């Protein structure tokens, strides 16, 4: 039986096949308790010994998904408000076939630039997930301020402005590209 890395939490069927496993060996590993089948093409490594993250599982159920909104804000340390669901953005023409019981996902459909701008691939050990960069997260929070909440939006923007690694030029560029410039200007005038 082949050796599965204990540093990688989830494998797709394609990844297992690319490292030399056959469908028969995959089924054998499931029966032996080495892998646990989450859905038709995603397997969980039972002997995983790294950090746990809901984001790994979210990507398993939404492969084109990008961590966004409050989940991204918490990831960057911009908010103390912990969301009860993982916020995931997907392209408008894609669907999430099966929503898992855990982690609960809040799926948001984005179109065009709102989806494609600012995607960053995060790698932790052998695990990968996509998340929007901090400036794109700020613009999305401002755009969805009525759903996120005005107080949370204010807290996130204040925390961003207090960071030494903030990039106001990039923030302004994203605001222009995503038609959120007027909202950003209003919030900055109030806070500064």
What role is predicted for each listed range?
Residues 1-3:
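Amphipathic, charged-and-aliphatic alpha-helical interface segments
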Residues 5-18, 25, 30-32, 38, ...:
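Nucleic-acid-binding surface
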